[in-house]
């Protein structure tokens, strides 16, 4: 695993642990627990981040996301958290046709 990815994963783990100690809604707690378990199972990091974003974005849009999760939400929506593959899957599947 790349050094930056390890650092990012460690920071995410730390933020998840801190957030789970806060007084947050059950919906938020469930999303964070799922992400934490996925990290423990060494699942694909971009997928974990995507699932966490899917769970928290509606809460952020509706302004019901707990204030204690704002730093975590900013962290997972930052550009360094996104997958930079930029269509690699399309190239892999359609590349043979050209």
Curated annotation (Swiss-Prot):
Role noted for this protein:
Imparts immunity to lactococcin-A to naturally sensitive host strains.
Q: Which organism is it from?
A: Lactococcus lactis subsp. lactis
Protein's name according to its UniProt entry: Lactococcin-A immunity protein
Keyword terms, alphabetized: Bacteriocin immunity, Plasmid
GO biological process terms, semicolon-separated: bacteriocin immunity
Respond yes or no to whether keyword Transmembrane helix is given for this record. Answer: no
Note the superkingdom of the native organism.
Answer: Bacteria
Matching entries from CDD domains are given as:
LciA-like (cd21059)
